[in-house]
Amino acid sequence: MSVIFAPDWLRGKAKVNQETIQRLLEENDQLIRCIVEYQNKGRANECVQYQHVLHRNLIYLATIADANTSSLTKAVE
């Protein structure tokens, strides 16, 4: 299960730290390897679930990056 899955009542309250981001990056690496392996074996249908988790992780990381960029811009102003 992805490290970003959390119940609705916890969303927005979880602390994002370097360890969490690193775990997501490592998970994404493993997901990409699984996706490539399934595709090489001609089993593209099986890799769809991994693609969904990878997509969710990437959106989450992009959201964190955008939030950090916004807060840095406001701090400079």
From Swiss-Prot:
Report motif location: SH2-binding: 50-53
Question: Which domain of life, per UniProt?
Answer: Eukaryota
Q: What family is this?
A: Belongs to the SS18 family.
This protein is called SS18-like protein 2
Tell me the classification of the organism that encodes this protein. Answer: Eukaryota, Metazoa, Chordata, Craniata, Vertebrata
Gene it is expressed from: Ss18l2
